[in-house]
């Protein structure tokens, strides 16, 4: 049930986010679609960092809650609020001040540039709220309560769709309209999840009078959350080079890529629900002293995430043209998008072996080495690929093939490390207990 609710939550979040692109593509034209799509890497970069930070909060709360350390849970909840808020405000400032420079780095097409800058600046107004929603969602997920965040996500998501239609069709705000709708809906979801935390009767309840940074707890949050956030950011940083490669083609290819890339978020986030469940369950069972359930949690999560990636990716491969038609009515843009779909359709499931294993290592408290492996296998490898293989062939397939290749390479290294980390972590349960005097 825990995994199913997380799956629905992640899938709904992606579908609501896709409504931005669908509304702007269908009602504001392909140029607006390309403008929004040109910002997706930066949105993924910064939101991915916040999600990684919240994963650290999730693991720490789950461990303390599983071990019944109520005081530590309380300290984590109140310290994490300030950490999350600070991260959201920092990203807001970066988005407002740095958007033009960031888009110039990617050689964004001139006809797409003004709309892309406007979208980023308005969208980033909701970053503090997004950070607070992820904070609340992480805490509820850590203790096994996933339905409340799902309900709040539904409310905010429906509001997002209605505001998208209102701002774009009625107010003719186009790019600014969908960004503003996202920011408002993020504020609503943050308010609802924080309000719910203040009304619970347990050690994870939020009391604004107790909000303070406990130094030791904050250090633990950052030790778990920053590597996870950095890992997510690394993927986005590497993808900046990929987006620059896409931008080296004409605007038509950029627009087609923008439409097809929505499938990445839909499928990957659906799979990510099982990664969070894996880390949370492994951390809880490890903290509760139940080693038999630790390994079982990993294999179940791996099987589910692989299956979801295979089914959704295969469906995308078969119904790709119908999927792309949700975002544009132009046949040439759909044809361009199908070039990405043709390569990626059956590649998504490969990433399960990498990401689920990383989540499992994090659930055992191992964060540094998995992050280093991701940096080498995903970031460094992808950059090398862009400047060698893609530079040689300069075709769209030669660019997109780096995804499954980097996932495979990184997965092998992560699995080898996890086997070692698992054996080392389980020693605590096999060591003989000292005899009583």
Task: Describe the predicted segments one by one.
Residues 3-58, 226-246:
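Signature of the first transmembrane helix
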Residues 3-4, 61-126, 170-226, 282-347, ...:
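Short alpha-helical transmembrane segments in multi-pass integral membrane proteins
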Residues 8-20, 122, 156, 185-189, ...:
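Transmembrane helical elements of multi-pass membrane transporters/channels
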Residues 15-34, 103-110, 166-173, 233-266, ...:
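Helix-terminus/linker motif at the lipid-water interface of multi-pass membrane proteins
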Residues 28-41, 116, 120, 179, ...:
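Small-residue hotspots at the loop-to-helix junctions and early N-terminal turns
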Residues 33-93, 130-149, 243, 256-314, ...:
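Small-residue-rich hydrophobic transmembrane alpha-helices
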Residues 45, 160-164, 190-194, 266-269, ...:
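Hydrophobic transmembrane alpha-helices of multi-pass small-molecule transporters
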Residues 54, 123-141, 149-157, 178-193, ...:
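Short runs within selected transmembrane alpha-helices of multi-pass transporters and secretion channels
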């Amino acid at each position: 049930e825990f995994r199913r609710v997380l799956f629905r939550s992640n899938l709904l979040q992606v579908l609501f986010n896709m409504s931005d692109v669908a509304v702007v593509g269908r009602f504001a034209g392909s140029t607006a679609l390309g403008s929004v799509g040109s910002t997706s890497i930066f949105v993924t970069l910064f939101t991915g960092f916040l999600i990684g930070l919240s994963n650290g909060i999730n693991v720490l709360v789950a461990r303390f809650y599983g071990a019944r350390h109520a005081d530590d849970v309380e300290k984590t909840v109140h310290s994490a609020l300030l950490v999350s808020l600070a991260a959201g405000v920092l990203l807001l400032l970066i988005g407002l001040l740095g958007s033009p420079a960031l888009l110039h780095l990617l050689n964004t097409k001139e006809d797409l540039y003004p709309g892309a800058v406007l979208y980023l600046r308005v969208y980033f107004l909701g970053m503090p709220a997004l950070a607070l929603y992820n904070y609340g969602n992480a805490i509820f997920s850590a203790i096994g309560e996933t339905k409340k965040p799902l309900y709040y996500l539904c409310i905010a998501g429906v509001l997002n769709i209605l505001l998208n239609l209102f701002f774009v069709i009625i107010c003719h705000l186009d790019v600014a309209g969908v960004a503003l709708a996202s920011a408002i809906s993020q504020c609503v979801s943050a308010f609802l999840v924080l309000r719910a935390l203040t009304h619970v009767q347990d050690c994870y309840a939020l009391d604004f009078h107790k909000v303070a940074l406990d130094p030791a707890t904050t250090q633990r949050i950052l030790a778990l959350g920053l590597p996870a956030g950095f890992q997510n950011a690394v993927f986005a940083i590497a993808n900046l080079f990929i987006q620059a490669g896409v931008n080296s083609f004409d605007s038509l290819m950029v627009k087609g890529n923008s439409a097809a890339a929505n499938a990445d978020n839909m499928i990957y986030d659906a799979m990510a629900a099982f990664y969070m469940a894996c880390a949370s369950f492994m951390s809880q069972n490890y903290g509760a002293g139940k080693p038999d359930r630790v390994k079982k949690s990993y294999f179940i999560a791996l099987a589910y995430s692989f299956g979801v990636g295979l089914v959704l990716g295969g469906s995308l491969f078969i119904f790709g043209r119908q999927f792309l038609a949700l975002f544009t009515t132009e046949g040439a843009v759909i044809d361009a998008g199908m070039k990405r779909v043709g390569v990626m359709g059956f590649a998504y499931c490969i990433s399960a072996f990498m990401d689920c294993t990383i989540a499992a290592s994090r659930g055992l408290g191992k964060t540094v080495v998995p992050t280093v492996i991701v940096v080498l296998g995903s970031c460094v490898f992808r950059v090398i690929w862009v400047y060698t293989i893609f530079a040689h062939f300069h075709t769209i397939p030669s660019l997109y093939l780096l995804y499954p290749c980097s996932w495979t390479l990184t997965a092998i290294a992560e699995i080898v490390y996890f086997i070692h980390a698992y054996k080392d972590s389980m020693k605590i349960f096999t060591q003989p207990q000292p005899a009583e005097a």
